[in-house]
């Protein structure tokens, strides 16, 4: 009959320091707890010990490496390596002192650190490697079939490292198990049952009562089949493809024993943004929901039956069960009654285990872990590259720094691109105001998911204060911007204080307005307009101006007035025209000056007066056809008006030849002496 022996070694202590009295251990495939609800991060062994030493203290044992060995016929059949999580010193007897310890994997160290941090552009194996190495765990490996895409933004939020690892592993369909070797244990991550290790020798089934065998065997095996979900459907949404449904489906197999048409599992959001991830997540969800559809439980004395190992069963009466199985949970019991030698009992050393199996071709999936929910909005600061004031992408998204992020340098690498809520957002219309670097913003999270931040508001603080002092200007509503890479601002503000109501508009440089139809303005009091430089106005058709009172105009330079058709002026009373030097009137064909009572031309003491009594010519001398020449004027020299927006100005018209006034004067004098009409209009009036 096979002989059993249990040994335990602790780092830095002699190998024979402890003897094992008994142990109870459990191991699970990528689970966080046992069937009884106890916490178990891979495996957990409670071991009762004895030692002839009475001076062993916690500092000699706790957090040290430890190894439990199971010997069969003098050879190590199984070893469990880990660290000591807890240590108990019990009673001191005549020859022995009693101790107890808890053996767990080094992975459990991750349960002792809670953190909040952001991982960017890293895939799951990279994130896990960081978590493990930060805890000094270097014995880990990945055996994966699927390619894992980098996650743009992955947040560990107020959760322990182990909870974070469990959550991500379950989301991505990763399970972990352990490979135990002398003096170490390796954490193995896999995404398929095909990648898990298999025992080298088949295990026989022996349920005969009283059966004796030196080789370990399985003594009990019961299979279980139950109805489970037959189909999963997941949906999600991405603002980059707003009209695409992102719906993915997965269908179960080996379901002949159950109905399939009604057992659909639908969930949204599925937490994916592309079809490739959606398909994988759907299958992972279905595998989890159907993981208990086909299971088996059993008992054995084979110490190598550990969670995460496959084995071939043989010699079962039901040939269908002689297949490859995967251990997903096991409980181990060992008792060594003769460990205390003279104080021990007479019983034999015994070992047994109980286990749960699934067919090895089925992928076992860990239970999805709850994702931390952000209780409400957070405060963050907009960040970007050094020297920039505004930093955004083509969607108007910005980067932010959260106060709780201890790993961020508060720059363009502090977060993913975060969408910004705008007051109105349509297709090529709406409002846009990009938060600038240094602004404090309010960040909410879609569905409470810390991986999906969105800016929903902005706030002032002690450094970034409002445009006007408060509460003195509490009646103002202000929209003020700030000049980018300069000083100044644009502003539209409203004053609502009774009696002082005002709409104020300030443009730091240009102010452009385009109105595609009518523009009506009604000012019920005064209007003041001051232009420090030029003014340009272009009217494509007509211009009408009505002034009920006076109209005054002061022009300190030249004035050009061009009318390309007729020009009509009508004055109800006095029309007075005064020129400091010269008045020049020219007509291309004729000039008519008509008065109802009198016309007078006067120079010094000489004058010509035309009235109802006749024509009066008075001068120191009157010359008729006696030589001389007509006087000349400077003529028209006006400039063409420039068009708005600085268009090229037209060339000024050529200067006109002055009129020969002397000849016209002689003609007038001659006509006056003869009593003849001086123009066609006069002839018409005389007739």
Language-model region placement:
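Assembly/oligomerization scaffold segments
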Residues: 1-117, 171, 293
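Short, basic/aromatic beta-hairpin or loop at an interaction surface
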Residues: 30-46, 275-292, 408-422
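Short alpha-helix capping/helix-loop boundary micro-motifs
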Residues: 46-56, 290-301, 424-430
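Short, well-ordered loop/turn sites that connect or cap secondary structure elements
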Residues: 60-61, 305, 435
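A generic structural signal for residues embedded in beta-strands
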Residues: 68-69, 313-314, 442-443
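Extended, domain-scale alpha-helical bundle/helix-rich regions
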Residues: 92-93, 122-141, 146, 154-361
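Structural signature for extended repeat/solenoid scaffolds and their inter-repeat hinge/linker regions
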Residues: 171, 189-190, 260, 375-602, ...
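Acidic, low-complexity/disordered segments
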Residues: 307-309, 319-380, 456-462, 467-477, ...
């Amino acid at each position: 009959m096979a002989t059993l022996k249990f040994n335990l070694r602790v780092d830095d202590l002699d190998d024979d320091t402890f003897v094992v009295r008994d142990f109870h251990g459990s191991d699970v495939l990528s689970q966080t707890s046992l069937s009884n609800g106890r916490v178990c991060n891979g495996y957990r062994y409670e071991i009762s010990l004895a030692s002839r030493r009475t001076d062993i203290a916690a500092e000699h044992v706790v957090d040290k490496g430890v190894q439990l060995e199971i010997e069969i016929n003098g050879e190590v059949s199984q070893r469990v390596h880990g660290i000591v999580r807890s240590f108990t010193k019990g009673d001191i007897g005549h020859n022995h002192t009693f101790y107890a310890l808890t053996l767990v994997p080094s992975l459990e160290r991750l349960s002792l650190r809670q953190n909040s941090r952001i991982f960017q552009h890293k895939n799951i194996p990279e994130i896990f490697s960081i978590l493990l190495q930060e805890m000094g765990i270097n014995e880990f490996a990945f055996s994966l079939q699927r390619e894992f895409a980098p996650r743009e933004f992955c947040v560990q939020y107020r959760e322990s490292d182990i909870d974070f690892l469990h959550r991500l592993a379950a989301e991505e369909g990763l399970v972990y198990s352990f490979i135990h070797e002398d003096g170490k244990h390796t954490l193995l991550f896999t995404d398929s049952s095909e990648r898990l290790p298999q025992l080298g020798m088949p295990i026989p089934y022996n349920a005969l009562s009283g059966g004796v065998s030196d080789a370990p065997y399985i003594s009990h095996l019961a299979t279980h089949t139950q109805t489970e979900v037959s189909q999963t459907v997941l949906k999600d949404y991405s603002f980059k493809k707003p009209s695409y449904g992102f719906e993915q489906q997965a269908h179960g197999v080996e379901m002949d024993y159950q109905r399939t048409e009604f057992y659909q599992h639908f969930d949204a959001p599925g937490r994916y943004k592309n079809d490739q991830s959606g398909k994988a997540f759907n299958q992972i969800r279905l595998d989890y929901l159907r993981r208990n559809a086909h299971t088996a439980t059993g008992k054995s004395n084979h110490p190598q039956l550990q969670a995460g190992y496959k084995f071939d069963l043989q010699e079962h009466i039901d040939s269908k069960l002689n297949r490859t199985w995967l251990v997903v949970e096991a409980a181990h019991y060992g008792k060594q009654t003769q460990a205390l030698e003279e104080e021990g009992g007479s019983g034999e050393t015994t070992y047994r285990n109980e286990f749960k199996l699934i067919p090895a071709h089925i992928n076992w999936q860990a239970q999805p872990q709850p994702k931390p929910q952000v209780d409400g909005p957070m405060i963050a600061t907009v960040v970007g590259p050094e020297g920039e004031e505004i930093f955004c992408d083509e969607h108007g998204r910005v980067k932010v720094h959260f106060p709780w992020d201890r790993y961020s340098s508060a720059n363009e690498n502090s977060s993913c691109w975060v969408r910004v809520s705008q007051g109105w957002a349509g297709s090529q219309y709406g409002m846009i105001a990009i938060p600038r670097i240094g602004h404090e913003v309010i960040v909410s999270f879609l569905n409470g998911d810390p991986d999906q931040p969105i800016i929903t508001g902005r706030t002032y603080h002690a450094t970034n204060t409002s445009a006007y002092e408060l509460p003195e200007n509490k009646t103002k509503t202000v929209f003020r911007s700030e000049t980018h890479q300069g000083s100044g601002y644009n502003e539209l503000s409203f004053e609502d204080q009774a009696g002082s109501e005002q709409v104020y508009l300030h443009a730091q440089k240009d102010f452009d307005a385009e109105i595609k139809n009518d523009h009506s303005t009604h000012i019920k009091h005064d209007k003041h307009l001051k232009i420090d430089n030029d003014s340009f106005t272009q009217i494509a058709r007509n211009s009408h101006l009505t002034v009920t009172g006076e109209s005054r105009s002061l022009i300190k330079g030249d004035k050009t007035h061009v009318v390309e058709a007729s020009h009509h002026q009508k004055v109800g009373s006095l029309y007075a025209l005064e020129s400091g030097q010269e008045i020049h009137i020219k007509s291309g064909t004729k000039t008519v000056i008509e008065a109802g009572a009198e016309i007078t031309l006067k120079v010094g003491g000489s004058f010509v007066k035309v009235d109802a009594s006749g024509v009066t010519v008075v001068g120191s001398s009157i010359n008729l056809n006696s030589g001389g020449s007509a006087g000349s004027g400077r003529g028209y020299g006006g400039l063409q008006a420039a068009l708005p927006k600085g268009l090229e100005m037209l060339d000024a018209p050529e200067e006109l030849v002055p009129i020969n006034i002397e000849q016209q004067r002689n003609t007038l004098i001659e006509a006056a002496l003869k009593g003849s009409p001086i123009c066609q209009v006069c002839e018409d009036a005389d007739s």
